[in-house]
Amino acid sequence: MKTIIVFLSLLVLATKFGDAKEGVNQEQKKEVTQNEFRVEYLNEMAAMSLLQQLEAXESALFEKEAGRNSRQXRCAMGDVPCTKGKTNCCKGYECKPKSPSWWYDTDFCQPIHGGRPIGI
């Protein structure tokens, strides 16, 4: 019976002092995790800033490349029907009547300066 009382008293003391240490440990854990989150947050913010800079540089390069490689798409060359209101003729061509003939109902893309257009 005496041994049981000794073990129970040791158990009570261990739990009492164990809880005290556990509280201190939890406070230390909170501080450590807060510091880790701060560091992780700062690292993440730096990474996001770097990512935004890279995306901005990449978009600028793509715009420059697209501007360099751009060309007129689907333009009409010589003797292709066109409409006066829409400019679907290529560079160096203009939409005008083919000849003073009455049977041509539409206009055609024709070179601006007679023969071969300038710039093509």
Swiss-Prot record:
InterPro entries of this UniProt entry? Toxin_22
Tissue specificity annotation: Expressed by the venom gland.
Q: Where in the cell is it found?
A: Secreted
Q: Name one GO cellular component term.
A: extracellular region
Q: What is the first-listed, main subcellular location in coarse terms?
A: secreted
Report disulfide bridges, numbered on this chain. Answer: 75-90, 82-95, 89-109
Single GO MF descriptor: sodium channel inhibitor activity
Give the signal sequence positions.
1-20
* Keywords assigned by UniProt, alphabetized: Cleavage on pair of basic residues, Disulfide bond, Ion channel impairing toxin, Knottin, Secreted, Signal, Toxin
**Entry text on domains:** The presence of a 'disulfide through disulfide knot' structurally defines this protein as a knottin.
Q: Which family does it belong to?
A: Belongs to the neurotoxin 14 (magi-1) family. 05 (ICK-7) subfamily. ICK-7 sub-subfamily.
Q: Sum up the protein's function in the record's words.
A: Ion channel inhibitor.
Please state what the protein is called. U13-barytoxin-Tl1a
What organism does the record attribute this protein to? Trittame loki (Brush-footed trapdoor spider)
